[in-house]
């Protein structure tokens, strides 16, 4: 049986909160999320910024800096509206014996 890894869930929650702060503070930003689910080993939040990119104040820069440092991977995509950053937390699940369901990225 798989259980959610509390450490990974804490990291995902922190990502959601930081992304939510940016979503509230920056006009026209779109927040998307893919919460943990048994069928996936990852969970992610994404922020789509319209271009040209808005001038970001220090609070927003600090939240973005946290997002980049707290996730396992960041994917950047060009969209019709602008640019989208997807921040992902890996290895969201553990088995009953405490083993993670996926190997660390450097082993795969």
What residue spans do the PLM features occupy?
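Short, surface-exposed beta-strand/loop "edge" segments at domain boundaries and coil↔beta transitions
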Residues: 51-58, 92-98
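N-proximal, solvent-exposed amphipathic alpha-helical segments enriched in charged/polar residues
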Residues: 1-32
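Conserved short beta-strand edge segments in small beta-sheet-based binding/regulatory domains
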Residues: 33, 69-79
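Ser/Thr- (and often Asn-) enriched beta-sheet segments in non-cytosolic proteins
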Residues: 30, 44-48, 75, 84-90
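C-terminal edge-of-domain segments
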Residues: 77-107
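Short amphipathic alpha-helices in soluble, non-transmembrane regions
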Residues: 58-67
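Short glycine-rich, basic-tinged beta-strand/loop micro-motifs
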Residues: 27-55
């Amino acid at each position: 049986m798989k259980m959610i890894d509390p450490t990974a869930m804490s990291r995902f929650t922190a990502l959601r909160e930081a992304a939510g702060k940016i979503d509230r503070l920056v006009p026209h930003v779109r927040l998307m999320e893919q919460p943990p689910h048994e069928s996936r080993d990852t969970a992610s939040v994404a922020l789509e910024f319209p271009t040209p990119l808005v001038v970001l104040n220090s609070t927003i820069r600090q939240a973005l800096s946290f997002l980049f440092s707290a996730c396992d991977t960041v994917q950047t995509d060009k969209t019709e509206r602008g640019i989208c950053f997807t921040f992902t937390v890996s290895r969201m699940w553990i088995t009953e014996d405490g083993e993670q369901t996926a190997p660390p990225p450097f082993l795969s």
